Swiss-Prot record:
Keywords: Chloroplast, Plastid, Repeat, Transit peptide. PPR repeats lie at residues 165-199, 200-235, 236-270, 271-305, 306-340, 341-375, 376-406, 411-445, 446-480. Pfam families: PPR, PPR_2, PPR_3. It comes from Arabidopsis thaliana (Mouse-ear cress). Belongs to the PPR family. P subfamily. One of its GO terms (biological process) is chloroplast organization. This is Pentatricopeptide repeat-containing protein At1g10910, chloroplastic. Disulfide bonds: none annotated. It comes from the Eukaryota. PANTHER family: OS07G0661900 PROTEIN. GO terms for molecular function: mRNA binding. Residues 1-72 form a transit peptide.
């Protein structure tokens, strides 16, 4: 007798026990079973397959639920529907178990009842009815709306062993990744490991997914992959797919090739998504030879390139400058029905225009419009930018106006493109209209928007408006461009807006970057001109060694004449400390100011006592002025100090500039 072989089994299970969205039933059916029996002989012929009826085991059988089960299910439903769920919860607290409360918590999250979810979670905490699933679900739902609150919930977990539960950790790490906070995510992950977390494959897949979204995510991804063997984790197809996507987004084609080979060695079969990432990595340098080899390899193993791969191949050809082959491939995309939207046309138009082939790009644009290809305006944006680069501002302006009419709502990229075209064409009215349109559509300006406007306002000599726009840009957290700010500082100085110029300088200075030394000197001249000597002193104090000697001398004399008298000694010490040689004129002006204000006696005495130790002495005319007024400062003390000056002056070769400035 031949032994039958079981080759097919289908099991249909009943709904979840506490699925409150399903209709309650008083009976529970036995799962339907469908079997196909094959004998060894029948394995060679399809006619020998014997298939049993699917309803062979479907004898109805009733099952009574316990009173406890029915009470809990009713309580769940009542709390979910209640307008005052906390009161219902308090009344039914003895009936509901932790798992029941978790069902309600998840229902609140799915329904978007965020405030109710938080209140329920806090109630569960207060009553000690909480589990790993509670924390994991709550963090997941709260983190989708407020990552800071999710972190607060995680940090509030009192039990250390619960805090490093892998499911809870994965939930909070996923929240951080989805909110673009990879650095914070990695720091928290490192802390979790120190506290005893045993990460699993989900943990690493979550972190690797975050590396795709950030600049220079490749080194961090490699570091994470290096941890896998230590944690007993092997890379699977999903993880390889993520790593290949990271390689592609960072232009690491050789590394992507190595990972593909490693996959094959480990017994994984790369699929079309893995190959798509490898192909994308070739697009960075336009390596069309390797791209063609890859396409040939794929076809040889039966993989048919999809829309994404063919579009990526088009990108490779364009980057490699193969425009004839790009046109041929675009035709193939059209034939396959893969060019129903504007993206492949835009890629080719952009490549042609940047290669100086504007008319060919225009031809593609007109062809696309003629075929009625679906467009969101991105193609218009490409052409407007191309026309601006070729200084064909009139055509760019006309196309921008056409775009405004055609597309009622535009994205920020398109708005910036049209704004730039109007600015380049000098169309102030259109510029103002575009800014109003952005406000009406609640579109927040980005770095490019601000840069375009500031440059335009400077060109139109609207320097205070350019300054105000720079303030707005800085307040939004955008990084200021030094060259543009330097130009604005210069023009603000020319219109005697010295305080505004200093404000722009400070925004640059405090943006955690090194600025060119010429800018320190430029702002110093502007501040001296505006008699903003206290601000000028700050510039000199922080950057004296990067400022030329003539400019330091100019600042020193200006400060001695009209700067804050209480800072005179400090200024002289800063100038000396920078290597600047202070001349007698500056000392004479400072001493004359002190003598004219007897209440500054201590400052005069401090200056006179400091000078000999640094190699400075008063000249004869200044000495006579001091002696003449010595009764105000103490004759004996003045005589003692001046005697030290006399002793220090003996080895010196006295020199005196011809021109002297005296205070009136």
């Amino acid at each position: 007798m031949e032994t039958p072989l079981l080759v097919g089994l289908e099991l249909r299970c009943p709904p979840h026990l506490f699925n409150t969205h399903s209709r309650p039933s008083s009976s529970l059916s036995i799962p339907a079973l469908s079997l196909r029996i094959l004998t060894p002989t029948a394995a060679t012929t399809s006619s020998a397959v014997i298939e049993l009826p699917a309803n062979v085991a479907e004898a109805p059988r009733s099952k009574r639920h316990s009173n406890s089960y029915l009470a809990r299910k009713s309580a769940i439903s009542e709390v979910q529907r209640s307008s005052d769920f906390l009161s219902s919860l308090q009344r039914l607290a003895t009936v509901l178990k932790v798992q029941d409360l978790n069902v309600i918590l998840r229902d609140f999250g799915i329904s978007g009842r965020w405030q109710d979810l938080i209140q329920l979670f806090e109630w569960m905490q207060q009553h000690g009815k909480i589990s790993v699933s509670t924390y994991s679900s709550c963090i997941k739902f709260v983190g989708a709306k407020n990552v800071s609150k999710a972190l607060e919930i995680y940090q509030s977990i009192p039990d250390e062993s619960t805090k490093i539960n892998v499911y809870i950790c994965n939930s909070i790490l996923s929240c951080l990744v989805k909110n673009g906070k990879l650095d914070s995510c990695i720091k928290l992950f490192d802390q979790m490991k120190r506290d005893g977390l045993k990460p699993d494959v989900v943990t690493y897949n979550t972190l690797l997914a975050g590396c795709i979204k950030v600049k220079n995510g490749y080194p961090k991804a490699i570091e994470l992959i290096g941890e896998l063997p230590h944690n007993g984790i092997q890379m699977d197809s999903v993880m390889y797919g993520t790593v290949l996507a990271i390689c592609a987004s960072n232009g690491r084609s050789e590394e992507a090739e190595n990972f593909i080979q490693q996959m094959k060695v480990e017994g994984h079969s790369p699929n079309i998504y893995h190959y798509s990432s490898l192909l994308n990595s070739y697009s960075w340098k336009g390596d069309y030879k390797k791209a063609d080899e890859l396409m040939t390899e794929m076809k040889s193993i039966g993989l048919v390139p999809n829309k994404v791969m063919m579009t990526t191949l088009l990108k490779v050809y364009i980057k490699g400058g193969l425009f004839d082959r790009s046109r041929e491939l675009l035709s193939e995309l059209e034939s396959a029905g893969y060019a129903e939207n504007e993206m492949p046309y835009c890629m080719l138009m952009d490549g042609l225009s940047k290669a100086g082939k504007l008319e060919e790009a225009r031809s593609i644009f007109d062809d696309m419009k003629g075929k009625g290809v679906r467009s969101d305006g991105y193609a218009n944006s490409i052409m407007i930018s191309a026309l601006c680069r070729s200084k064909r501002f009139k055509e760019a302006k006309e196309l921008s106006r056409d775009s405004e009419t055609t597309y009622e709502k535009c994205d920020l990229v398109m708005l910036n493109t049209m704004l730039c075209a109007y600015c380049r064409a000098g169309e102030m009215e259109s510029v103002m209209r575009m800014m109003k349109k952005m406000d009406e559509q609640a579109v927040s300006p980005d770095y490019n928007t601000f840069h375009i406007l500031i440059k335009y306002f400077i060109k139109e000599k609207l320097h205070l408006l350019a300054y105000q726009t720079t303030l707005d840009m800085h307040s939004k957290g955008h990084r200021l461009e030094e060259e543009l700010c330097s130009s604005l500082i210069y023009h603000l100085g020319k219109i005697r807006a010295q305080a505004e110029a200093f404000s722009v300088y400070n925004m640059l200075r405090y943006s955690k970057r090194t600025i060119c030394k010429e800018l320190h000197e430029k702002i110093l001249h502007i501040l001296i001109q505006g008699n903003l000597l206290k601000d000028a002193y700050i510039v000199v104090k922080d950057n004296a060694k990067m400022i030329s000697q003539p400019t330091l001398k100019k600042f020193g004399r200006a400060f001695m004449i009209s700067g804050n008298i209480n800072l005179v000694n400090d200024v002289l010490k800063v100038l000396h400390g920078s290597g600047h040689k202070i001349d007698q004129v500056q000392f004479e002006i400072a001493i004359s100011r002190y003598i004219s204000q007897p209440d500054k006696k201590e400052l005069l005495l401090q200056l006179l006592q400091w000078m000999p130790g640094q190699g400075y002495v008063v000249d004869s005319s200044t000495r006579n002025l001091i002696l003449k007024n010595s009764h105000m400062f103490g004759r004996l003390l003045i005589a003692e100090i001046l005697s030290k000056h006399h002793v220090a002056s003996r080895p010196m070769i006295k020199s005196r500039p011809e021109q002297k400035f005296r205070c009136k």
